[in-house]
A protein has these predicted regions:
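Active-site-proximal cap/loop segments of hydrolase catalytic domains
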Residues: 1-4, 9-224
Length: 224
């Protein structure tokens, strides 16, 4: 991204791991609220410091970061001019009701962050703080990235947001990988992803794109 003319800000918002138990616990129950506030505060700081152009800011994330990216577009639609939403949890209640089997030992930690699907008050908050239920608030262009083999959040969440956004006439684009899951593993897919992201940002923010077109036909050929 820096090579394409963008300043990049990676935020360790509250609730992030690797910064101590107190910092992590500060995110419990704060998804879509204070955890999101941290992203907004960091963005406003970058604007105030003259690092960021307030008219050319995008938000990007994958997995929970994809959730945060989607929430940024529906919760703070005047701040972000574009969003890239990758492999995202978009319906918190759905995710809580149908967690992947691999999460068996970590469901207690999940509930600390997002609540208990069997508690009515928690369910209400899940619905209120799920991007899928606030697509009508989106103003910025969005690029949805997903893998049809995603066994963590389930590709259907991505499909639902794309469908809803199109029905509402939103500026929505998508990059879907048939043979990828919760992330992008194949180098050919990574090339497609990098190209689409830089083209998307160039269109909506004005950065550079191109100058490596020769590698794409090679990737497409080797992928067949």
């Amino acid at each position: 991204m820096v090579n394409r003319g963008y300043a990049v800000l990676a935020v360790n918002f509250r609730g992030s791991s690797g910064l101590g138990k107190i910092y992590q616990a500060a995110g419990y129950g704060e998804y879509g609220r204070k955890m999101q506030d941290d992203l907004v505060d960091a963005t406003l700081w970058a604007i105030d410091q003259g690092i960021a152009d307030p008219n050319a800011i995008a938000i990007n994330g994958s997995s929970y970061g994809g959730y945060a990216s989607a929430m940024g577009l529906v919760r703070d639609p005047d701040l972000f001019k574009a969003g890239i939403i990758e492999h995202a949890m978009l319906d918190v209640a759905y995710q809580s009701q149908y967690p992947p089997h691999s999460w068996g030992l970590y469901l207690g930690q999940w509930e600390r962050y997002f609540g208990d699907i069997n508690t009515p008050g928690d369910i209400d908050q899940m619905h209120q703080r799920s991007p899928i239920n606030s697509v009508a608030r989106m103003q910025a262009a969005a690029l949805m990235v997903g893998g049809k083999r995603d066994r963590v959040v389930g590709f259907e969440q991505t499909e639902r947001l794309i469908s809803t956004a199109k029905e509402l006439g939103k500026n929505i684009d998508s990059l879907i990988f048939e043979n990828e899951g919760h992330g992008i593993d194949k180098w050919q897919s990574r090339i497609r992803h990098a190209r689409r992201v830089e083209d998307f940002l160039a269109e909506h923010l004005g950065g550079r794109s191109g100058n490596w077109d020769w590698i794409e036909p090679i990737a497409a050929y080797l992928d067949n």
